[in-house]
Amino acid sequence: MGGQKGIALFYQFFAPHVNLTCITTKNNAAAVKEYEVLNVLSDSKFRYVNLSYFFKLKKIIRQKKITHLIIEHPYYGWLGILLKWFCKVKLVVHSHNIEALRFKSMGKWWWGILWHYEKLTHRNAALNFFIHDDDREFGIKKFKLAPDKCFTITYGFELTNAPTTEERQSAKHFICNKYLVDAAEKILLFNGTLDYKPNQDALDIILEKINPLLQAKEDFNYKIIICGNKLPAAYNNLNNYATKNIIYAGFVDDITVFFKGADIFINPVIDGGGIKTKLVEALGYDCTVISTKSGAIGIPATITGNKMKVIADMDWEEFANEVALANTVTGIPPAFFDHFYWGNIATKASTLINNL
């Protein structure tokens, strides 16, 4: 998922600036050369309430003379607060969403309980990193956080420039050959973990709203490629849509090929919170984006040039019109990489932490 990838890339670029030890789950077998990884946490869903971790992490902190503790998301807030009190470390909360609002948008009854816990966690932090400016403002206004303790540390992109025209053409040629797409057809892409409700809702919108509108446009030739795992069995691998310009690619080994080869990335997501990491990646690979307003939160329009069109939520007719009229020639401007390059983001984060 995008959030997990974002955490891994953040620390990859962050590690050269600090002496970093990462505490993670036992099933996280990723080989990392930039920093030390300790597989301390259980894979069980009950790991978030395991009190023994206080004693284990307290020992590690003292042995390694750790001075700062970063927690990803608020769920280990209780543990971070205890370690802050007993080990005198400076607590940093790295938020990827306002989690309570994300679960509220998904209809979870307990979102209010999480809201108060999330607030408590952030209020005990020496620094709060939010994924975009709207979340930062929310933290200041609703959680009553001090503005000088709140900063935007966004999701990033690994490269400092877009792929060449030749790279994009090669990727499109690969996709056309693999999925029998005519070279003259526009390739529309959507990807995500498909049992995650916001992504599943977006898929339903593509199938039931957007695609029928595009099919009605006689002069627009296209294929929609859906990438992602965990598609519920009820969808029958989208076989019923095979004759309706829909291609289900499933899980793909290298999604970057699809970002490079697609003409347009469509993002009809209307809930879920946070920054849509797939948009950052699509734009970074110079793919034109058509998105709902909710789906484009955290992507400043001032740095995307003509590569991203933002449509009002639920206006699917206008969404389809913009897809058909999309400019796929103009490139993503350099300002995008100034803002979203992981190296710049990590430098900002490390400077803030080192200045505590």
Predicted regions and their residues:
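N-terminal subdomain of nucleotide-sugar transferases
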Residues: M1-A29, K64, K217
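Conserved catalytic-core segment of nucleotide-activated headgroup transferases in glycan assembly
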Residues: G6-F13, F157-L238, Y248, V252-D253, ...
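Membrane-proximal helix-turn-helix segments that form the acceptor-binding/catalytic region
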Residues: Q12, F55-K59, W85, W109-I131
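Active-site proximal beta-strand in glycosyltransferases
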Residues: H68, K84-F103
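Acidic donor-binding loop of glycosyltransferase active sites
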Residues: A126, N245, K260-G274, C287
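Carbohydrate-associated surface elements
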Residues: D134, I153-G156
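Short hydrophobic beta-strand element within catalytic cores of glycosyltransferases
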Residues: K278-E281, T288-K293
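A charged, aromatic-enriched C-terminal amphipathic alpha-helix characteristic of glycosyltransferases
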Residues: T328-L356
